[in-house]
Design a protein with these regions (language model features):
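NTP/phosphate- and nucleic-acid-binding module
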Residues: 1-514
């Protein structure tokens, strides 16, 4: 665990050092759980969003996009249930004066059982060597079975408390399992209570006439209240979807783990409207489709898993998370939910407007059911960063820091470098860069030795480096260096675009999804 924490600290430091992510308001010592994306971070973030957007709106004829406002009529949040039910169970430690989410404390305790099991497996693997069967060992070893049973007992009790909204039981679990404050090391806990996560502000020119409004805690409601607008103007027929990328805001008390949990974040959400009774079939299809989208990036299939919800949200009849293995454990990067017809029915009730769809095939009107896919851009960004960072030991004894980013998401696709800053090489390098820059994000670099320049590009995840030397002036060939293998080959300038495109093209990645 300590090794993983150390690794995560290095990733966070690397992100700031190379211009991926900065603490917001840094010169004023920052603002808790708020971050800015730097010059490389914004490019990679935009590439992630483009991959998602095009996978939704280009690959599906029945999915269109919108961009709804952050401020919306306050009654929307009453209708959606956020005013009454958008809460976290919080608990304070009297000694450290720190506040925690009770459910997270218990989930962390469950993770300790998982860690114990993995340690037993690792010890056995060393003992038995290549013939070791991890799954068989887990299912037969008495020590592992004992740990697994204790975990299951905790999980069952925790799931019931969450489903029953039993705050007293959540505290009792914390006491019974002797969960201590990570700072003070004590068990001096307050009672658990609910805390609403929405930011409230006022809209209006005078305080007397001002209206209370909220910063949206999710983008989904902007889609639901525009259901009729989109359906009618685009003549959409069910099943169809509406996609949106936008900022959301939550007053997270326990914001932590860098950009994983923030107070201002960005979501990519798609609401897919279906016939009542067909929602669970579509739920299963979108589970499969979304996992395929993640795995297509090549960050390791073993790093993903589904996690079905122990407690369903007030609007759902099925829900699962796609979790990714971060340095601090498996964590949610995307949620897929069957939201039933709750949202549209609620908005019909509170607005007084009929929100239904007339199905010509069934010759009847109904309130559609909804399948939601919701992915956090920032969490996706972090998963890419964490899976890509490596301190690689080279044969000569040196260490290079490299980001093995999915090449389609890399902020810079190709760096163009003159070997020396004379003899016309910079002019030739500029000519090549001007040829490539209309299709690929390029960087020109002529400072320091070629080796140092290669290391700089490795550290920001640039897939290709193109070096212009004296031979280039004679035969129009260049050296192209591949980031991951560090292999170099001599090619004609006319071959450059084809080689680069075959590796970094978003089109090829999208084709793999079809």
């Amino acid at each position: 665990m300590a090794k993983q924490e150390d690794s995560f600290k290095k990733i966070v430091s690397h992100a700031k050092e190379y211009g991926f992510v900065f603490p917001s308001s840094d010169i004023y010592d920052g603002l808790g759980a708020v971050y800015d994306y730097g010059q490389l971070g914004v490019e990679m973030k935009n590439n992630i969003k483009r991959y998602w957007w095009e996978s939704m709106t280009l690959l599906h004829e029945n999915i269109v996009g919108i961009d709804s406002a952050i401020f919306m009529h306050p009654t929307i949040w009453k209708a959606s249930g956020h005013v009454d039910a958008f809460n976290d169970p919080l608990i304070d430690n009297r000694d450290s004066k720190k506040r925690y989410r009770a459910d997270v404390l218990i989930e962390d305790e469950m993770a300790k059982f998982d860690d114990k099991i993995e340690k037993e497996v690792a010890k056995a693997a060393k003992r038995f060597g290549e013939s070791f069967d991890a799954e068989l060992f887990k299912s037969t070893n008495p020590r592992v079975q004992e740990i697994a049973q204790k975990r299951e007992e905790l999980h069952t009790r925790f799931a019931k408390a969450m489903n029953d909204n039993d705050l007293a039981e959540l505290k009792q679990i914390i006491l019974d399992y002797e969960i201590v404050d990570p700072i003070s090391g004590t068990k001096n806990w307050t009672d658990v209570r609910q805390f609403n996560l929405m930011f409230k502000t006022e809209m209006g020119s005078t305080s007397e006439g001002a209206m209370n409004v909220y910063l949206r805690p999710e983008t989904a409601q902007g889609i639901f209240v525009n259901f009729l607008n989109v359906q009618k103007t685009c003549r959409m027929r069910i099943p169809f979807g509406i996609a949106q990328i936008g900022k959301a805001f939550r007053n997270e008390i326990v914001a932590r783990q860098f950009i994983f949990r923030m107070r201002e974040f960005e979501q990519m959400e798609m609401q897919f409207f279906v016939r009542p009774g067909e929602e669970l079939d579509w739920f299963a299809k979108w589970k499969e489709t979304r996992l395929k989208w993640h795995k297509a990036l090549g960050m390791g299939d073993h790093k993903y898993r589904y996690h079905d919800h122990d407690k369903l949200a007030h609007y759902a009849n099925a829900a699962t998370d796609i979790e990714f293995e971060m340095p601090f454990g498996f964590k949610e990067v995307e949620g897929i939910h069957s939201r039933t017809n709750f949202d549209l029915s609620q908005h019909e009730k509170y607005s007084g407007k009929k929100i239904q769809y007339f199905d010509p095939e069934m010759n009847q009107s109904y309130t559609p059911y909804v399948i939601e896919t919701s992915i956090g851009v920032d969490r996706m960004f972090l998963s890419v960063l964490c899976s890509s960072y490596e301190e690689e030991k080279l044969e000569n004894g040196e260490t290079r820091v490299v980001l093995h980013l999915p090449k389609q998401l890399a902020p810079v696709k190709v760096a163009v470098m003159p070997l020396v800053r004379k003899d016309g090489l910079p002019d030739k390098a500029r000519e090549i860069m001007n040829m490539l820059k209309f299709d690929y994000a390029c960087q020109y670099d002529e400072k320091d030795s070629i080796g140092k320049r290669y290391r700089r590009q490795d550290a920001i995840g640039t897939p290709f480096c193109v070096t212009v030397d004296h031979q280039t002036l004679e035969d129009n060939t260049v050296t192209i260096r591949h980031r991951d293998s560090m292999a170099q080959e001599r090619i004609s300038i006319s071959e450059l675009a084809g080689i680069i495109d075959s590796e970094v093209s978003l089109k090829n990645l999208l084709k793999s999804l079809v």
